[in-house]
Amino acid sequence: MVHRMMPVVAEAAGLPFKHEPVVLRRSRPQVRDYVIHKFDEDLPPADLNGLQSALRLFGLIPDSLELRPTMIDLLTEQIAGYYDPDSNALYIPADIEPFQLRVVVSHELVHALQDQYVRLDSIITQRHVNDRRSAAQAILEGQATVAQIPVLMPEQKPDTLPLGWFWKQRTVMAAQQAQMKEFASAPLWLREGLIFPYLGGADFNVWFRRKYFGRSILDSMPRSTEQILHPERYATHDEPTELAFEGRAGDVKWEDGLGEFETRLLFQQHLGNEAEAITLATGWDGDRYQVLGANADVLVWYTVWDDAAAASRFAAGLQRAWAKRRTVGRSDIKQLTVSGRPVVRLVYAPAGWSGWSSIPTIKLSGGGE
């Protein structure tokens, strides 16, 4: 099957295979063991605790949710096969249904092809650059989603689909996955985060193939989910502004950024309106947060915006969103100007936090309109 699919996948992806990957069968317990191994490798205990604290402080996951078992159960439920860069092999569950086999192999075969041109491990294991990593995952999963279509439906030409078509299938995909126990009970951040790389990434790939016919997206990958959501920003080389915290390194439990897509999810989670969330996150140009404190109970989040209007709109929305979530500490949302750029700062911490008088500051570099 793999040998027959390879020419079609190669043509759809616009890249020839350098060699044929191996296909191996695995039992469900072996698949789960692989998920656990990869999860623990990607998020060692200190990183896991830091990320979990951040997500709780943002209100993206409940305080009662333990991230590790939740994600392991969810990923185990979702995985119908996988490509492992370490062994250059496709792994297929031994109990996979025949009708699923072509779908899984065609998709994972694209990942095997991608790995022959870029080091997948170096892309998907980037640390403390969440938004850039999310954008890269969207390219990889989106390309695989688009390239597998000619294998499964030769009469369908992905390049003829209207732009945005894949994202419009999100409700259908979510409804199908909602029949799965772990997915149905997962927080919005997890559910949407699983779907976005496939559908949002597929839409970007279709746009790229039309705009830059004959070029490989793997040669110049987007650096932010903003560029995935707004491809014209990629075309105009609108790179995100880099934010760097100054001082307090010894007190930091975790540091990263949300990006435009997860900023959308933050508003969608707390305000319950997707259209409004999209509006409030539009104009994002960069962000960075730190989790501080002995108990990892302090959040300092800076966002930089394309213009003052976008910053004001975001700040007002954040005030409403934060008022709607259950908080036990003190919060402070301020509009600032840093290096001539409009910035919004959120601080959420216990009222007695000693750092209220010396809140960490940031410096900016790159980006901008």
Regions inferred by a protein language model and the residue ranges of each:
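Extracytoplasmic/secreted envelope proteins and their assembly/folding machinery
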Residues: 2-6, 10, 103-107, 141, ...
